[in-house]
Amino acid sequence: MAIRSFKPYTPGTRSRVVTDFSEVTSSKPERSLVVSKHRKKGRNNRGVITCRHRGGGHKRLYRIVDFRRNKHGVSAKVAAIHYDPHRNARLALLFYSDGEKRYILAPADITVGQEVISGPDAPIETGNALPLSSMPLGSSVHCVELYPGRGGQMVRTAGASAQVMAKEGDYVALKLPSTEVRLVRKECYATLGEVGNSEIRNTSLGKAGRRRWLGRRPQVRGSVMNPCDHPHGGGEGKAPVGRAGPVTPWGKAALGLKTRKKNKPSNKYVLRKRRKVSKRSRGGRDS
C-alpha cells in the first residue's frame, strides 16, 4: 500500500494526499455481512446533541466484523480485502472451511489466499488469533480482548499494535500504542501482527468538502461566538479568553484536564501510565 499525492490543478487537490487503495481487491461488500444502520448525527435518544460537529455525509452500510474470533480450530482462507467506510482499517473477508463467511480487521501484509486460524494451538503467524498466554514475548498483537470472550476492544485502529512485554501468574503485560503498560488476563485473545493501512496517518483530506463527505461538520472557535453561545465569546475585537484557562461550551476546564476517575477499579492493572502529550504535538484548538 502506498499514498498518492496530486498536482495543484485546483485548490482542493493542492494539499490532497490519499491512499491508493491498491490492497483493496473488491469494491462490493459481502451482502450477508452488511446491515443498515441509523445515523445518530451526534444526538442521543432524546434528540439532544451530545457530540458536536456530526451530521451529513455519504450513506453507509455497516459491515459486521468478527472481533471475537471464536471459531477455534476451523481454518479460513482470505478471499478478499475490502474497504470499510466506518474505520480507517481494511477488512479481510474470510471463507471458513465449514462454509461460513466472516469479516476481520485486515492485518498488515496479509494476502488473498492466505490461511488463518484461531485457537490455543494455532501457529505463530500473522492473522492467527491466540490467547495471550500462547503469545511469545515481544510479539506484536492487535484486536486485544479486555475480558475473555467479550471480543477485541483495544488496538483496532489502522497501523496500531501492542507488544507482549511479560507474563506473570494469570496476567500478561502489554505495551499499548499510547505507551501505557497494562495487565490483561492470559485467557484473553488477540490477533498476531499489526493492523494494516498504517499510511493513513500520512494522508490529508485537502479540502473541507471531503470532511463533509465523512460526516464531519464545521468546527467554530468559541472566541468568535457571542457570550450567550460560549464562555470564550464576546469582547471587542480579538479578546482573550478572560479566564484562567480554556473551557468547554459548558464551562468545564478543557485542553489538559484529566478525565479518568482516580479511584477507578481497573487502575490496579495499569503498570505504567501513558505519556503526556504536549500542546505542540496535540495541535489543539479553541473549544
Swiss-Prot record:
Q: Which InterPro entries match?
A: NA-bd_OB-fold (IPR012340), Rib_uL2_dom2 (IPR014722), Ribosomal_uL2 (IPR002171), Ribosomal_uL2_bac/org-type (IPR005880), Ribosomal_uL2_C (IPR022669), Ribosomal_uL2_CS (IPR022671), Ribosomal_uL2_dom3 (IPR014726), Ribosomal_uL2_RNA-bd_dom (IPR022666)
Name a GO molecular-function annotation.
transferase activity
- Any single GO CC term annotated in Swiss-Prot or TrEMBL for this entry: large ribosomal subunit
Highest rank taxon of the organism: Bacteria
Q: Identify the stretch(es) annotated as Disordered.
A: 221-287
| Basic residues: compositionally biased ranges | 258-287
**Protein name, UniProt field:** Large ribosomal subunit protein uL2
**What is the species of this protein?**
Prochlorococcus marinus (strain NATL2A)
The record's gene field reads rplB
